Amino acid sequence: MSILSVKNLEKKFGDLTVLKDISFNINDGEIISIIGSSGSGKSTLLRCMNQLETITSGTITIDGKTLVETKNGTPVYAGKDVLKEILMETGFVFQNFNLFPHYSVLRNVMEAPVCVAGVPKKQAEKKARELLKKLGLETKADAYPCELSGGQSQRVSIARALALEPKILFFDEPTSALDPELTGEVLKVIKSLTDLNITMVIVTHEMAFAKE
């Protein structure tokens, strides 16, 4: 069953067309890699599917809910409640981590469940600690982002994305900001997530990893 559907997607920045007539379906539980040359619109496509960029035209459906569709040549987005539902069903791992620098690792992972989903703090903390343990970060719960290595920061970013128990996880070049020796560390973590049966869409330049 298709959990993510994109139809005739177009995205322009002014007169520059970045995405043109993009259509595809991704089934529940699939792991898909998006590869292409730098500047080809891979990250923009991911951002369009995750409500971080508005589209120019087309239709995006996530888990049976229409995120956006084109009516009379204009993209029309779903209402606030549906957008929130979709947001809580998707997680996004950024190139540059995007952690809150003034929050501890634990609070970074807890923040969305508590503030967006309304999960009680004790429950959110329990889940956050479980995720940090799974990703080998249980000893870093009270540390701050400035005290972490790049690989550790990216693992915290992955834990944060998993905290809302999303159905789809988007990775935008998850190793691009890392030193070469840390790349394997993060790729190993991503591979370990396959047992969670989460649909994953990964933008990457790591061709060997994409093949796996």
Where are these regions (language model features)?
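Catalytic Walker B motif of ABC-type/P-loop ATPase nucleotide-binding domains
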Residues: 169-172
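Helix N-cap at the start of a conserved alpha-helix in ABC-type nucleotide-binding domains
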Residues: 180-182
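H-loop/switch region of ABC-family ATPase nucleotide-binding domains
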Residues: 204-205
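Conserved ABC ATPase signature
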Residues: 144-148, 152
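A short, proline-enriched helix->beta-strand linker immediately N-terminal to the Walker B motif
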Residues: 163-167
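The feature captures the beta-strand-to-loop junction immediately N-terminal to the Walker
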Residues: 35-37
